[in-house]
A protein has these predicted regions:
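A structural signal for small-residue-enriched, beta-sheet-centric alpha/beta enzyme cores
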Residues: 2-82, 86-99, 106-367
Length: 367
């Protein structure tokens, strides 16, 4: 099924250089989509560090369970992704599928099975024909290329209308560091640790425990701060890989000053990808950013912001171009957070509509 490209989509896929120690290839399994790649294989330099954030759902996909276990070792040498089938709610057969695909990747790339990370996205509840996928892996391992980002980003899409990628260059000491990521997401987008699939690669030399801290704290204001339909997916996965190929200075902690520029670059890539996902929300016509100031805490501000963003009445007002500010006040009230009505102000863009608990003098909602 051909999907009409989102009106909020960027004009072109960004030009993104390769990351040393990362190569990839794609293939067509034909399990669901015809004439387009739906398999992605990524080979990573030996001793690559990995960090991840995964869905909090009580019914996670089989690949999510696999990744959760493998993340404990903090090392990766391969990533394999299939689209079209989420491998969720598939019982023991789903777990078998993950194991057999990982074994095939391990054999093709000559790496430990425990260093292979997996992800799936697509229809829930359908058994994954892993035997058909496995036949594609040997050829994929022979066609690995560096900087294959557009094809890689396309292979992991489902109902997306455009592939998503972002890249930044940062400094660690005097070393230039590449940070490049791809993502997919269109439906079931709601902040719950991670939100969709995203894979970020860097050539920085960062231990997995420090990498995990950097990823976890930057998820909060990027992937964890977006919503389209308020539904959290069963397959949400964000993985961050650091090959160490740049031979940069090894940081002593996540707060080491040497990582300041790197963390800014990482956050930029994550925020860019998160916004692209919102722009590709199913049926999306507008991108709205909710800013909350003056709350008792960041946690409180976040809860209020999400109450506004997820409100059906606020969404319909925005969709209809109706500046119904009362619905925003309603959403603040239902958030469950403490709010002083006499101090609430509401602005749409640069226009102040209500201030200190009352509509501003002379405001007219009529067009």
């Amino acid at each position: 099924m051909d999907l009409k490209k989102s009106p909020l989509a960027p004009k072109n896929f960004p030009r993104m250089p390769g990351v040393t120690g990362v190569s990839s290839s794609t293939s067509l399994s034909g399990l669901k989509y015809k004439g387009r790649p739906d398999l992605l294989l990524v080979k990573l330099k030996s001793n690559t560090s990995v960090a991840g954030v995964l869905t909090k759902t009580s019914v996670p996909g089989c690949p999510v369970t696999w990744c959760k276990d493998k993340l404990q070792k903090g090392k990766a040498q391969a990533l394999f992704v299939n689209s079209g089938n989420a491998n969720v709610f598939t019982g023991s057969e789903g777990q078998t599928a993950v194991k057999e695909i990982a074994k095939a990747v391990s054999a093709a790339l000559k790496c430990p099975t425990s260093s292979v990370f997996m992800a799936s996205t697509g229809v829930i509840g359908e058994k994954l024909n892993y035997k058909k996928i496995i036949t594609k892996i040997p050829k994929m391992s022979e066609n690995l290329k560096e900087g294959n980002w557009n094809k890689a980003a396309t292979a992991i899409t489902t109902t997306d209308t455009f592939p998503k990628g972002a890249s930044e260059v940062a400094l660690i000491g005097n070393k230039k560091i590449q940070i490049t990521g791809i993502a997919k997401g269109s439906g079931m987008i709601a902040p719950d640790m991670a939100t969709m699939l995203s894979f970020i690669f860097t050539d920085a030399n960062i231990p997995s425990n420090i990498l995990q801290t950097l990823l976890s704290r930057n998820v909060q204001n990027t992937f964890n701060a977006i919503t389209v339909d308020s539904d959290a997916s069963t397959s949400d996965t964000v993985l961050l890989f650091a090959t160490g190929a740049a031979k940069s200075i090894a940081p002593t902690s996540a707060d080491d000053p040497v990582l300041k520029d790197f963390e800014l670059g990482l956050q930029s890539v994550m925020l860019n990808l998160a916004k692209q996902i919102v722009c590709d929300g199913e049926g999306a016509q507008k991108l709205i950013q909710v800013n909350v100031t003056g709350a008792n805490s960041k946690k409180s501000a976040r809860k209020i912001g999400l109450a506004i963003a997820n409100s059906p009445l606020v969404k319909t007002a925005i969709a209809g171009g109706d500046a119904n500010w009362g619905r925003v006040v309603m959403a603040v009230g239902k958030s469950g957070e403490k709010a002083n009505p006499d101090k609430i102000s509401v602005c749409f863009g640069k226009t102040t509509i209500a201030e200190k608990g009352a509509v501003v003098e002379g405001y007219d909602e009529a067009p």
